Design a protein with these regions (language model features):
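Intrinsically disordered, low-complexity segments enriched in small residues
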Residues: 1-92, 96-615
Length: 615
C-alpha cells in the first residue's frame, strides 16, 4: 500500500512517545505529506492557538511515494501554524531525511506540548528515544548534525534540526536537513525552538516496498523517469544550470523585483546568474560552482554546490567557510541580491551559507533587508541603529545583517521579526512586500498577473510554490499564456494550486511538474497504493487539501481582506521592460477566483463546497 501504516506521537511535555495506526481513510482522502499532515493538524488543534505556545502542534509527514523508486521521492513536509503569518504553515524539503523516516517504518511524527529542557528525538526503526539535547543547544545546523552522528557512531543517520535562528525563535527560522536542504518558509523552525526540540535523527533499515503491484510500479516509475529525461527543463536546464537558470530569463521578461520592488529589472542580474556561477573568477581562475547535486531518488539533480573566493571580504579570517556548501538557488540569489540591489555573487553565497548554518529562510530575510534599506534611504533608520551604512547595493551591509539576525545581536532582533512587523513598527507598513505577513518570492505580480493572484490567495502567505503559474506565463508549460492578461488567470491559478497540492502530498518534488502532469503521477500511485488514484481523483484530492487549508485560515481569523497585494503593486506601475506601465489586476481576478473555488464574497467556503469535497 506504500504507506508505512503508522505514525509516531510525541508528547514533549510528558516525554512520552507512542505509536499509532495511520488513519487509512484519511490517507486515501488526503494522500500524505502536506495533505495528510494538515488533516491531522486541523482535526486535533484549535486554529486560534498562539503559534509559539505549547498548544500548537508540529508535524513531520512523508507521502506514499516518499522513499520509493519514484523519481524525486525524497520529499517531506513540516506542518504547523506559522508564527510569521498566523496561518497554516506547510513547508516542504528534499534531501534524504524524508526517505529515511519512511524506511524506518513511519509515515509521520506528531509533536505536541513543550519539553521542559532541550531534547532531540532519535528514531532507529521501531526503537524511539527522546534524548537530552542540552549539549546541542546553541550549536549551528552544521555542528548539530555531525555531533549527533558522532554521538551514536552512525554516519548514516539523517538529521532534521534547527540552528540558532530556531532556538531564538526568529519568525522565519527554518528546519534544515542534510546540512543544506530546508523546510524554509513560514517560521516552522521557530515553532520547533519554542518546544525546546532541537532535532529529529533517523536511521531506517526496513526499506519501502509494500506496493499493490510491484511490477506495475517499476514500469510506471521507469516511464515517468523517461519523461523527465526527455524534457528540456528537467532533462537539460535544471541539471546544467539549476534553478538559477531563471535569473536572466525573468530579468528579460521585466519581472525581477529589484530594490524592494521599486524596480522590475536589475542591471546586475548577469553578475548573479547561473552563467556567472559557472564562469571562472579573475581572482583565482576558479568558478564558484563546483558541481550539481541530487536529493534522494532524484533524476533531475538541480542542487548546486559552490565555493566562495577565499580572498573575499566576507570570509577573510574565517577558514571554516573555505569549503564547499549548498547553493545558490534562484530564490535565494534573488532575495539576497536583486531585492537589495546587490550584485556581488560571493557575498550572496556567503549570506546563503549563513542562512543554512543558522537555519533561516533567505527569501524572507532578503526581502526584509530590502525594506530595511529603503527605510534607511528614507532617513527612517540610521547608521547608528543599523551598525552600518545600508544603502541599496551594499554587499557589506548584507553580510553584516546576515551575521547578526539569528544571534539577535543589535538590529538583528528587528530583522528577526520579518518585514511586515518591522515596517509597521517604523510607520511604513506599505514597504513590506508580503501577503499575510510572508514576503514575496522572485517574480513581480504586477507584470505577471497570474502569479500576483497566486500570491494573494496562497494559504501560507506569498509563495510561488503553491501555484507556479510562471510555468505557463513565462515558460509556456503546459501551454503559453500571456503574462499581462488577466482573463483566464483565475482558472489557471486554481488549476496550478490544486495540482501542486496533489504533487506535494504524494511525496514528490514539484519540479517534476515541468515535465509531468497528474497523468504521469497517477499510474505510479495506482501501482503503489490502489486503483482509486485516477487523475480525476487526484485533482479532487488537491482541491480538497487547498480548501481544508483555507478553512483552517478562516477559523484562525483570515478573510477576503487578507487576499491582497501591497499598495506598491496596485498603484506604482512597472518602470521598464516588456511590462512597463503595468499594475496588478488583482481586483479584476479575485471575484472570479472565489466563484471557481466555491467561496462566498468574504472568502469563506460555501456549504455545497464543503459537501462536495467531504470537508
Amino acid at each position: 500500500m506504500s504507506w508505512a501504516g503508522k505514525l509516531l506521537r510525541v508528547n514533549l511535555t510528558k516525554g512520552i512517545c507512542q505509536s499509532e495506526a495511520l488513519n487509512m481513510q484519511w490517507a486515501k482522502d488526503y494522500l500524505g505529506s502536506r495533505g495528510l499532515g494538515t488533516k491531522y493538524l486541523v482535526e486535533e488543534m484549535d486554529a486560534k492557538v498562539d503559534p509559539l505556545s505549547p498548544e500548537n502542534k508540529i508535524i513531520w509527514a512523508t507521502g506514499p511515494l516518499t522513499g520509493t523508486m519514484a523519481s524525486t521521492g525524497g520529499r517531506y513536509t513540516v506542518i504547523t501554524k506559522g508564527p510569521l503569518t498566523g496561518a497554516i504553515a506547510c513547508s516542504n524539503s528534499g534531501g534524504y531525511w524524508g526517505a529515511e523516516l519512511k524506511m524506518a517504518g513511519w509515515d509521520m511524527v506528531i509533536f505536541e506540548g513543550k519539553s521542559p529542557k532541550p531534547v532531540y528525538l532519535l528514531i532507529q526503526d521501531d526503537e524511539v528515544q527522546l534524548l537530552d539535547a542540552t549539549d546541542l543547544w546553541g550549536k549551528s545546523v552544521w555542528d548539530t548534525e555531525p555531533a549527533i552522528k558522532a554521538k551514536h557512531q552512525d554516519p548514516q543517520i539523517r538529521v532534521s534540526c534547527i540552528g540558532r535562528a530556531g532556538e531564538n525563535q526568529v519568525l522565519f527560522a527554518a528546519v534544515v536537513n542534510d546540512l543544506h536542504r530546508a523546510a524554509g518558509r513560514s517560521g516552522v523552525g521557530a515553532v520547533m525552538g519554542s518546544k525546546n526540540l532541537k532535532a529529529i535523527a533517523v536511521r531506517g533499515t526496513k526499506g519501502v516496498g509494500n506496493f499493490k503491484d510491484p511490477k506495475a510500479f517499476m514500469a510506471a516509475s521507469k516511464a515517468a523517469k523517461a519523461v523527465l529525461a526527455g524534457n528540456a527543463v528537467t532533462g537539460q536546464g535544471l541539471p546544467t544550470y539549476g534553478t538559477q537558470v531563471l535569473m536572466n530569463v525573468i530579468n528579460e521578461v521585466g519581472a525581477l523585483p529589484t530594490r524592494n520592488h521599486r524596480d522590475v529589472q536589475f542591471e546586475g542580474a548577469k553578475d548573479i546568474s547561473a552563467e556567472a556561477m559557472a564562469t571562472p573568477r579573475a581572482s583565482d581562475g576558479k568558478a564558484q560552482l563546483v558541481t550539481n547535486q541530487a536529493c534522494f531518488g532524484c533524476t533531475i539533480a538541480c542542487g548546486r554546490v559552490s565555493k566562495i573566493d577565499q580572498t573575499h571580504f566576507s570570509i577573510q579570517n574565517k577558514p571554516q567557510y573555505f569549503g564547499a556548501s549548498g547553493g545558490l538557488e534562484y530564490e535565494a540569489a534573488w532575495a539576497l541580491g536583486a531585492a537589495n540591489g546587490v550584485n556581488d555573487l560571493e557575498a550572496l553565497q556567503y549570506a546563503n551559507m549563513i542562512c543554512n548554518e543558522d537555519g533561516f529562510d533567505p527569501i524572507t530575510f532578503g526581502a526584509t533587508i530590502g525594506a530595511v534599506m529603503e527605510l534607511y534611504e528614507m532617513g527612517l533608520l540610521t547608521k547608528e541603529q543599523l551598525g552600518i551604512d545600508a544603502k541599496f547595493g551594499s554587499a557589506q551591509a548584507l553580510c553584516h545583517f546576515v551575521d547578526i539576525t539569528a544571534k539577535g545581536e543589535g538590529f538583528g532582533k528587528e530583522i528577526a521579526l520579518g518585514s511586515a512587523r518591522l515596517t509597521a513598527k517604523y510607520g511604513q507598513p506599505d514597504l513590506s512586500m508580503s501577503v499575510k505577513g510572508q514576503e514575496f518570492p522572485a517574480y513581480d505580480g504586477r507584470v505577471i498577473q497570474g502569479i500576483g493572484l497566486a500570491y494573494a490567495t496562497s494559504n501560507r502567505g506569498a509563495c510561488h510554490l503553491r501555484g507556479y503559474t510562471i510555468a505557463s506565463e513565462v515558460l509556456g508549460i503546459p501551454v503559453k499564456t500571456e503574462p499581462a492578461d488577466t482573463v483566464g488567470k483565475p482558472g489557471l491559478v486554481k488549476a496550478f494550486q490544486d495540482a501542486t497540492a496533489a504533487f506535494d502530498s504524494a511525496g514528490i518534488c514539484i519540479f517534476t511538474s515541468f515535465a509531468w502532469t497528474l497523468a504521469d503521477v497517477a499510474p505510479q500511485l495506482q501501482a503503489a497504493c490502489g486503483d482509486e488514484f485516477t487523475v480525476e481523483n487526484l485533482t479532487t484530492i488537491g482541491e480538497r487539501i487547498w480548501n481544508m487549508e483555507r478553512d483552517f485560515n478562516n477559523r484562525a481569523g483570515f478573510t477576503s481582506k487578507d487576499d491582497k497585494l501591497p499598495k506598491r503593486l496596485m498603484t506604482e506601475a512597472a518602470k521598464t521592460g516588456p511590462g512597463k506601465g503595468s499594475i496588478s489586476g488583482l481586483d479584476k481576478m479575485l471575484p472570479e477566483y472565489y466563484d471557481l473555488r466555491g467561496w462566498d464574497h468574504d472568502g469563506q467556503l460555501k456549504s455545497d463546497t464543503r459537501t462536495r469535497l467531504g470537508l
